[in-house]
Amino acid sequence: MISRIPGRDLGKAVGHRVIVKPFSGATTKAMNHYLKPSLEFSPNEVILHIGTNDLKTREPKAVAESIVDLARQIESTCDTTVTLSELVCRKDKLDQAVKTANKHLGKFCHQNGWKLIHHENISYNGLNKGGLHLNSKGNVQFYNNFKSHLE
């Protein structure tokens, strides 16, 4: 999903540099490895949009806890602000798991003082025919949610 966010355009819209690094199909475990090179540059903020791929094999609370572990690892590695991004709805049997994971993410963000980018404004109408990825309408909402956070 994040691969359709044009970092350069988003940066121009919010008035500062934005780098988008998509890792399609990645799980929270894989992100431990993918993030390390990016953290060497000490970014001002890291926004984590991860977890949907974990829901196929793990319970929603465990997925949220893995995201939190990743966020804590980032905080312990460099002086950066961590923001979490809600999982986006789906039109399959995992949609309820997405909602449950998002509730846990909200609680964990509150407990840790992190911001959470909400995506409840993306409905099934924002999904493609397969029901798992965003269509053009959903991509616009997704982009705008990140833009609103970064402004």
What kind of region is each of these model predictions?
Residues 9-19, 26, 32-151:
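Alpha-helical cap/lid subdomain in secreted, periplasmic
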Residues 2, 25-26:
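Short active-site-proximal "capping" loops at secondary-structure junctions
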Residues 1-8:
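Catalytic nucleophile-elbow at a beta strand-turn-alpha helix junction centered on a G-D-S/GDSL motif
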